[in-house]
């Protein structure tokens, strides 16, 4: 019998796992209008506030006036514009690599890069808390897919030793884990990839523009950028735009151009997006960018400390992603609704995004948040958390 779609939707509702879209009005600043009222936005990845920055908007408008609204084709047909080449050259300089390649999204990047690098007879090692796009890329590759416990380097070493000689070996990790806000131990991963002759790929979607002295990401923070084979990141979080990139050797980029299906078979990014990304990189390199990173780091530390003092488990967060552990799905979503009523938009996170029993409020900080708004948010969370028996 054909499985009922209506029945499947009802089951999601009964399990507290049903999802729906909420429309917000205005730009992605620290405040938006949701359900007819202005609220403080605490779940955006617009970490530096660049999505509404005048420099990015001006660059996008000028690009549209000169180049039009679309690229017209995939990159290997006629869709490689001078803006693509200019952005990729800028990204390579930004990351200190020989070359870079842009993709249409972080999901498209990971689901295209990994199958281009490994296949049948090869092995890919993935942290158990890696992003879904990495998981799907590993599955699509048809390589042997080995998941190691989160940040457990002893377990990873045992698995590498077990599979030594099994073909090409690829280690893939998030740089900043998107649901916990903690960091991958990159120096230890570099040591293991050297010892076992593996490739190392780091998805730095949530570190690009934020971490490191000059905003180059988690690899810069740990001073291991030169030892990472592929540095992937996005243009749509701290950089305020849309799309993704990978920075690597010229040889690796050449292989991806020829093998990454999500790159080959997609119409390329449009002019406005490309120009805005270049403007964002310039801003990250400026004194203003440095000031924004410092303000973000300060706000994140104050917010995290205040939540911990209020009794919340912030799950080892070290970055601008600050989760507050709730536990089960129903109280997490009740918490979300109550906070919205109080004027704070925080999204509850449920399975399959996170493991069962670890539902949470995923709070994300922006450099443009007012400290007073963050203080009020913590007070509201503490009050509601006590009412729900969470703290």
Curated annotation (Swiss-Prot):
Give the Enzyme Commission number.
2.3.1.47
Positions bearing N6-(pyridoxal phosphate)lysine: 237
Keywords, ordered alphabetically: Biotin biosynthesis, Pyridoxal phosphate, Transferase
Q: Which residues bind substrate?
A: 19, 131, 353
Positions that bind pyridoxal 5'-phosphate = 106-107, 178, 206, 234
InterPro entries named among the record's database cross-references = Aminotrans_II_pyridoxalP_BS, Aminotransferase_I/II_large, AON_synthase_class-II, AONS_Archaea/Proteobacteria, AONS_Proteobacteria, PyrdxlP-dep_Trfase, PyrdxlP-dep_Trfase_major, PyrdxlP-dep_Trfase_small
Q: Does the keyword Transferase apply?
A: yes
Cofactor(s) it depends on:
pyridoxal 5'-phosphate
GO terms of biological process kind = biotin biosynthetic process
Please name the pathway.
Answer: Cofactor biosynthesis; biotin biosynthesis
Q: What EC class does the entry list?
A: transferase
Record GO terms (molecular function): 8-amino-7-oxononanoate synthase activity; pyridoxal phosphate binding
Swiss-Prot/TrEMBL catalytic activity:
6-carboxyhexanoyl-[ACP] + L-alanine + H(+) = (8S)-8-amino-7-oxononanoate + holo-[ACP] + CO2
Q: Which CDD domains match?
A: KBL_like (cd06454)
Highest taxon above the source species: Bacteria
Q: What does this protein do?
A: Catalyzes the decarboxylative condensation of pimeloyl-[acyl-carrier protein] and L-alanine to produce 8-amino-7-oxononanoate (AON), [acyl-carrier protein], and carbon dioxide.
Q: Give the family from UniProt.
A: Belongs to the class-II pyridoxal-phosphate-dependent aminotransferase family. BioF subfamily.
> NCBIfam families recorded for this chain?
bioF (TIGR00858)
Complex and partners = Homodimer.
Q: What is this protein called?
A: 8-amino-7-oxononanoate synthase
Annotated organism of origin: Geobacter sulfurreducens (strain ATCC 51573 / DSM 12127 / PCA)
What does UniProt list as this organism's lineage? Bacteria, Pseudomonadati, Thermodesulfobacteriota, Desulfuromonadia, Geobacterales
């Amino acid at each position: 019998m054909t499985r009922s779609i209506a029945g499947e939707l009802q089951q999601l509702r009964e399990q507290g796992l049903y999802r729906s879209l909420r429309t917000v009005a205005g730009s992605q600043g620290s405040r938006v209008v949701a359900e007819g009222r202005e609220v403080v936005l605490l779940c955006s990845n617009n970490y530096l506030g660049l999505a509404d920055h005048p420099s990015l908007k001006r660059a996008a408008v000028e690009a549209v006036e000169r180049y039009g609204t679309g690229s017209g084709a995939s990159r290997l047909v006629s869709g490689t514009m001078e803006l693509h080449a200019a952005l990729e050259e800028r990204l390579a300089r930004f990351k200190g690599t020989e070359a870079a390649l842009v993709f249409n999204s972080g999901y498209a990047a990971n689901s295209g890069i990994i199958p281009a690098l490994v296949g049948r007879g090869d092995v890919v090692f993935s942290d158990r808390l890696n992003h879904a796009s990495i998981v799907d890329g590993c599955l699509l590759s048809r390589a042997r897919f080995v998941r190691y416990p989160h940040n457990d380097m002893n377990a990873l070493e045992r698995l590498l030793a077990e599979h030594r000689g099994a073909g090409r070996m690829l280690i893939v990790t998030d740089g900043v884990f998107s649901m916990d806000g903690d960091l991958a131990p990159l120096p230890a991963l570099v040591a293991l990839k050297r010892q076992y002759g593996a490739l190392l790929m780091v998805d730095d979607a949530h570190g690009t523009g934020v971490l490191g002295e000059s905003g180059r990401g988690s690899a810069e923070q740990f001073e291991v950028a030169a030892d990472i084979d592929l540095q992937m990141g996005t243009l749509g979080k701290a950089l305020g735009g849309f799309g993704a990139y990978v920075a690597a050797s010229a040889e690796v980029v050449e292989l991806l151009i020829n093998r990454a299906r999500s790159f080959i078979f997609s119409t390329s990014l449009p002019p406005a997006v490309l120009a805005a990304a270049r403007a964002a990189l310039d801003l990250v390199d400026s004194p203003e960018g440095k000031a924004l990173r410092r303000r973000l780091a300060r706000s994140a530390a104050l917010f995290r400390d205040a939540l911990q003092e209020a009794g919340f488990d912030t799950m080892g967060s070290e970055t601008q992603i600050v989760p507050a552990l709730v536990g089960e799905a129903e109280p997490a979503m009740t918490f979300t609704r109550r906070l919205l009523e109080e004027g704070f938009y925080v999204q509850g996170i449920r399975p399959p995004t996170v493991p069962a029993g670890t539902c949470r409020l995923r709070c994300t900080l922006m450099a443009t948040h007012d400290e007073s708004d963050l203080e009020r948010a913590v007070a509201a969370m503490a009050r509601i958390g006590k009412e729900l028996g969470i703290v």
